[in-house]
Swiss-Prot record:
Residues reported in the UniProt entry to bind ATP: G37, V38, T39, G40, S41, G42, K43, T44
Helicase ATP-binding domain mapped to chain residues: 24-412
UVR domain mapped to chain residues: 635-670
GO cellular component, one term: excinuclease repair complex
UniProt domain Helicase C-terminal: residue ranges: 429-591
Assembly: Forms a heterotetramer with UvrA during the search for lesions. Interacts with UvrC in an incision complex.
Cytoplasm among keywords: yes
Subcellular location(s) of the protein: Cytoplasm
Gene that this sequence comes from: uvrB
Domain of life: Bacteria
Listed name of the protein: UvrABC system protein B
Residue ranges annotated as motif Beta-hairpin: 90-113
Keyword set, alphabetical order: ATP-binding, Cytoplasm, DNA damage, DNA excision, DNA repair, Excision nuclease, Nucleotide-binding, SOS response
Gene3D superfamilies: P-loop containing nucleotide triphosphate hydrolases, UVR domain
Length: 677
């Protein structure tokens, strides 16, 4: 089946040329291309058109779950008749196993799995193994983490068709081998029930039941039914039932794995004893022996993933299987926000290894645990045959990979221009800034000011407050959740000015901001590099009156690059608007935009056509089922939510952290209501 792009939007601005260039590059086998697209230029729509043109399975890689969810929603809208899947970590909460030698502290693994995401992950792998070409998988960096052998997964697919002869009990055993569990009382995802000649299977990767009806030893009927009403959704002549778990194995493989594990245990214990680590030897022997007993009796144990190398039949040091192994050879990878995503992919292996070294050296795990890991960056590169890097500020790596050839997309369908950039002397910069602030306040617009240090941010805030300017500051010492409120207050008009040290985060993508002031712009460094200055200047790119003022005593190379590039883009945007009679339109950003919305749209009133632009920002809302929890369960859920909130805040994912905060407050209110006092 081919991709079928469904959209009321038409490519405009730079989009047609970008689509043509990228499509040609992929079809000609170019290994790497870079799409340099400014914020709001409709990069997602461009990529959707490229996918439809090349008709290849595609992996869209995003650097966090929130953006992945937004992309998933958008691509579902573009390809409603094709397989658009979502593959991210299925943990709502995850505390990895770790050991801290300095304090002799062992931290046990703790987790909470999101059943819905688990279903979506299975749907993604099932779609890839179905053989269809029209598959788009939107993924986070989870795609490079270890999972089951795709061959084992595929070998456990059950193919049935009407009229085929198969004994019912044999069929039931096949279901059990595919890790479906029989439950005739309560049917949940991954279960099946038997009523006479009818077998109902709650597919692990779907919201529907599969009903298989037998007539003796012959399959008489196959149909998908609604699990609640029992109404038939669709009949089938043939059907493939995919396994209920990504990690498949056989009894023979399990016995072989146990034998190999016990052999390696003997060697590692002997090694510890030879270097005088009797305590570590004893600890390792007891832990692994207990795990083997659990696997023999129950088929699994806590931390079984640390033995994955044995179950997969891999040699020591070889890479694990991952989502990329489920794709055919001729697939395309699109790396969104590549300047962030590529370094993240590069860092995953090192972080995982650093944690596991202590577990191995102190006798908590066998050395084979090191092979349950994400891909090394070199391994990822070897599997990525064709890549499109997408970024407003591509890094040197992407430019080198694409041999300096960049496909530009700088025209916005809204007609908005890149902001005007002015350089002013740092002498009397605060007085000059005060004048500019007053001009914006009169127009009910907002201002961002970026400084080099926390102390400067605080002192400038105090000065502006003393001059009756409504303002606040954010930096790493400000409570992370308080930052969310401060930014929301800026949008609401509680503050007119927000001052910070690093204002590059997506949480500060604010259309109300018409002025960005960069103090000490000539101080070269991380916060004043070319890419940082470009990203900072981009904060004003969503406002019709967008302007950037750099206060400096000299123009550095980074400043010159940023100014020249912005002016070049602006000239191109102006020329396009004049040629096509387009008037720039201010973006109206919804305050509670759901990630499952299908984007924003703009209408060219002069021509009556619509064009697609990216939504201004994603926003995930948690919706847990807590009404019927016991007090203990609710307390545990609150603690997990608190940890998730703190983790999101540490990553400066402000919107996500705010949602967890709201969820936590609701649970606290529920706790007080159900158990007062």
């Amino acid at each position: 089946m081919n991709f079928e792009l469904t959209s009321a939007y038409k490519p405009t601005g730079d989009q047609p040329e970008a689509i043509a260039q990228l499509t040609e590059g992929v079809l000609e086998g170019v290994p790497a291309q870079t799409l340099l697209g400014v914020t709001g230029s409709g990069k997602t729509f461009t990529i959707a058109n490229v996918i439809a043109n090349i008709n290849k399975p595609t992996l869209i890689l995003s650097h966090n779950k929130t953006l992945a969810a937004q992309l998933y929603s958008e691509f579902k809208g573009f390809f409603p008749n094709n397989a658009v899947e979502y593959y991210v970590s299925y943990y709502d909460y995850y505390q990895p196993e770790a050991y801290l030698p300095s304090s002799d502290t062992y931290i046990e693994k703790d987790l909470a799995i999101n059943d819905e995401i688990d279903k979506l992950r299975l749907a993604a792998t099932s779609a890839l193994l179905s053989g269809r070409k029209d598959v788009v998988v939107v993924s986070s960096v989870s795609c490079i983490y270890g999972m089951g052998n795709p061959s084992d997964f595929y070998n456990n697919v059950i193919e049935i068709e009407r009229g085929r002869t198969i004994n019912r009990n044999v069929f039931l055993r096949r279901l059990v081998d595919s890790l479906y569990m029989r439950n005739d009382i309560e049917l949940n995802r991954g279960n099946f029930r038997v009523k006479g000649d009818t077998v109902d299977i709650y597919l692990a990767y779907s919201d529907n039941l599969l009903r298989v009806t037998f007539w003796g030893d012959e399959i008489d009927g196959i149909e998908e039914v609604d699990p609640v009403s029992g109404v038939t959704i669709a009949p089938f002549e043939a059907y493939k039932i995919y396994p209920a778990n990504l990690f498949m194995t056989t009894k023979e493989a399990t016995l072989r794995a146990i034998h190999e594990i016990e052999d390696d245990l003997t060697k590692q214990v002997a090694y510890f004893e030879s270097i005088g680590k009797e305590y570590e030897a004893k600890r390792l022997y007891e832990r692994v022996t207990y795990d083997m007993e659990m696997i023999r009796e129950l088929g699994h144990c806590s931390g079984i993933e640390n033995y994955s190398r044995y179950f997969d039949g891999r040699a020591a040091g070889t890479r694990p299987y991952c989502l990329l192994d489920f794709f055919p050879d001729d697939f395309l990878i699109v790396i969104d926000e590549s300047h962030v995503s590529v370094p993240q992919i590069r860092a995953m292996y090192g972080g995982d290894r650093a944690r596991k070294i202590n577990l191995v050296e102190y006798g908590f795990r066998l050395p084979a645990a090191m092979d349950n890991r994400p891909l090394k960056f070199e391994e990822f590169e070897s599997m990525a045959k064709q890549v499109i890097y997408v970024s407003a500020t591509p890094a040197d790596y992407e430019l080198v990979q694409s041999e300096g050839i960049v496909v530009e997309q700088v025209i916005r369908p809204t007609g908005l221009l890149d902001p005007v950039i002015e350089v002013r002397p740092s002498l009397n910069q605060i007085d000059d800034l005060m004048e500019e602030i007053q001009i914006r306040i009169e127009k009910e617009e907002r201002i961002l000011v970026t400084t080099l240090t926390k102390r400067m941010a605080e002192e400038l805030t105090e000065y502006l407050l003393n001059n009756n300017v409504r303002c606040n500051y954010i930096h790493s010492d400000v409570d992370t959740l308080e930052r969310v409120k401060i930014m929301d207050d800026l949008r609401q008009g509680v503050y007119d000015v927000l001052i910070g040290v690093n204002l590059l985060r997506e949480g500060l993508d604010l259309p109300e901001v018409s002025l960005v002031a960069i103090l000490d712009a000539d101080k070269e460094g991380f916060l004043r590099s070319h890419r940082s200055l470009t990203q900072t200047a981009g904060r004003a790119a969503r406002n019709v009156n967008g302007m950037v003022i750099m206060y400096a005593d000299k123009i550095t190379d980074s400043m010159r690059l940023t100014i020249d590039e912005t002016n070049r883009r602006r000239e191109k945007q102006l020329a396009y608007n004049e040629e096509h009679g387009i008037t720039p339109q201010q973006i109206k950003k919804a305050r509670n935009l759901s990630v499952f919305g299908n984007g924003a749209e703009t209408e060219d009133t002069q021509k009556g056509t619509r064009a697609y632009v990216e939504p201004s920002s994603p926003n995930i809302a948690a919706d847990p089922v807590v009404q019927y929890m016991s007090k203990t369960q609710l307390e545990k859920s609150m603690e997990r939510t608190r940890k998730l909130m703190q983790e999101a805040a540490k990553k400066l994912e402000f919107i996500e952290a705010a949602q967890y905060r709201d969820e936590l407050l609701k649970m606290e209110d529920l706790m007080k209501e159900k158990w007062p006092g």
